[in-house]
């Protein structure tokens, strides 16, 4: 089995430190971690992170709850860099499966990190939704 270690952080100093560590293969973050790290503007802070971490994979999460807006944000986030994965929660705040969002972004060959996955049923739905040609990370909690 191959295991890759990803840091779930948003603090720039810690990202700099772990980015130089070969054991760490990439990063993931989310809007609440970024707020906690002092980010005032999501996009500009994300781009600061990308100046530090421009070779290892990094996931930036959509923060919209509406499928149309999630897709729009996902497309925009994807354009920030070749090492970017778009992080999409498996369900929205209404407990609805985000399959439409996942399918749409995946069909555009956008790399995804599908997050907040808690059940085998959710994992199975994701696997039925993705095209399996484009890179996808499934973050199981």
Model-derived segments and their meaning:
Residues 110-141:
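Catalytic alpha/beta core domains of metabolic enzymes, predominantly
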Residues 2-3, 9-16, 21-24, 28-108, ...:
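Active-site beta->alpha loop and helix N-cap motifs at the rims of alpha/beta catalytic domains
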